[in-house]
Design a protein with these regions (language model features):
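Acidic, metal/ion-coordinating pockets
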Residues: 1-189
Length: 189
């Protein structure tokens, strides 16, 4: 809030991975809660368009990709293209359980996978996204990858050589997608 200037942010959460109902992740219906499946993305695109009409900024959080693969897959790019064309300003992905690139699709940032933030008892690199907004301008003014380590179901911010190691990994992954990360993790595309 900058001088009582407000910004409306829409958040849509969906899964492209789970195609079928199971007891843990039942699909949402008009009368029952559950997950929003987008194996057929047409409904997702409509929801993004509706959100775009009612919000200043639209974020789509999506469960997608291939587990344990650090490289994004072609289906993620196809879906990201449709989501951004429908009006999303930022896509944040998960499911691979490892870090994947931060890229740009149609000029909009896509964090393909931030790894595991709080999931298992093993040790793995992970990260946060810091999104900076200007409510006055009604837009995102910065995007930063913050390196973390998940160990024993606890997450810690990384510093020093470990922070630089994870930032280098993300720079290498993201560079092939046209995104650069500075020494503090701020992205540019």
């Amino acid at each position: 809030d900058e001088g009582n200037t407000k910004m409306r942010i829409a958040l849509i959460s969906t899964t492209q991975v789970e195609q079928f109902d199971n007891p843990d992740t039942r699909g949402a219906t008009d009368t029952l809660p559950g997950v929003f499946r987008c194996w057929d993305p047409s409904r997702l695109y409509e929801e993004v368009k509706t959100a775009r009409e009612n919000a200043d900024f639209v974020i789509v959080c999506i469960h997608w990709g291939v587990e344990s693969e650090m490289q994004k897959e072609y289906r993620q790019d196809i879906l990201a293209d449709g989501i951004t064309k429908a009006g999303a300003d930022l896509i944040v992905g998960g499911h691979p359980h490892v870090l994947q690139a931060i890229g740009a699709v149609n000029g909009k940032p896509v964090a393909y996978s931030l790894g595991n933030f709080y999931f298992t008892s093993y040790t793995t690199d992970t990260g946060l996204l810091q999104v900076q907004f200007s409510a006055k301008e009604k837009k995102m003014t910065g995007l930063r990858f913050v390196p973390c380590l998940q160990s024993g179901t606890a997450v810690q911010l990384l510093e020093g050589a470990e922070k630089e190691r994870v930032l280098k990994e993300m720079r290498d992954l993201s560079g092939s997608c046209g995104v650069s990360l500075d020494e503090d993790g701020w992205a540019s595309w």
